């Protein structure tokens, strides 16, 4: 009995505990990042934003949660009921499951696997199924058109993201996210004679063009402005979510924002040194790594929100041209250049 507990039950309980803790922290983080998104957008437009529920409106996201949960879900008469209700669960579950391999600090991940980057890419490519299911099951042309747009957009920019990840893998020599962070503890800043490890060693500097491509592709992959053609209010209203209400709509919304925070976390890990402090000095090393990680995620999300506030929406043909005719050839060329440089210089 003791062997069964130590070998099987205890590891299972630890994994379940880690998962529940991550889920609670992630949902709270998403709630306040959504609040920050609305506040930033309001500030740019000289409005006050959410300011009624709780002090300074800090409880607005939780009030919205209660509102969605207590509402009655309405299913269109001609909809495929099973697929219609399954689609938002698929979207939210896939978005949440990618966080299993995200290390928020040294050794702080639910599942430690040495191909974490490949796992994230694989799960992210499946998220399009939830969108397609929701658009098709609604039995309406507008959700279906929005779903087709979303599928084409996500597939188009996943290619560029894939090539960006290849360059990071070439520089780091690993698919393990923890190893990728460790590799950024020394780099071009140290090579150029900077007295101690710093933010100049992170991948954002040595791979700056790929950093920009990844950031813009992340906006397109998550259907954020200026690439929110899926939810173009003047054309398709809310895209594939037009016929959804109540809890199913909330699950789609949750999946969308969890995916956005995931892209912010990936940007932090791949290019901004993960949980590493900006300067390797004792008074910054004293700050826990998870604090640096969360601050960097919030910094990236701030720019996600600012782009939404001041960049106008692209036309659909411009969106596709940017992905296939600009980002794809440029990222492919960068892969070749990076691989050639590493082979003939010996840097790694």
Swiss-Prot record:
Domain of life: Bacteria
Pfam families linked: NADHdh
Catalytic activity of the protein: a quinone + NADH + 5 H(+)(in) = a quinol + NAD(+) + 4 H(+)(out)
Keywords: Cell inner membrane, Cell membrane, Membrane, NAD, Quinone, Translocase, Transmembrane, Transmembrane helix, Ubiquinone
Disulphide bridges: none
GO biological process: aerobic respiration
PANTHER family in the cross-refs: NADH DEHYDROGENASE SUBUNIT 1 (PTHR11432), NADH-UBIQUINONE OXIDOREDUCTASE CHAIN 1 (PTHR11432:SF3)
Protein name as catalogued: NADH-quinone oxidoreductase subunit H
Gene: nuoH
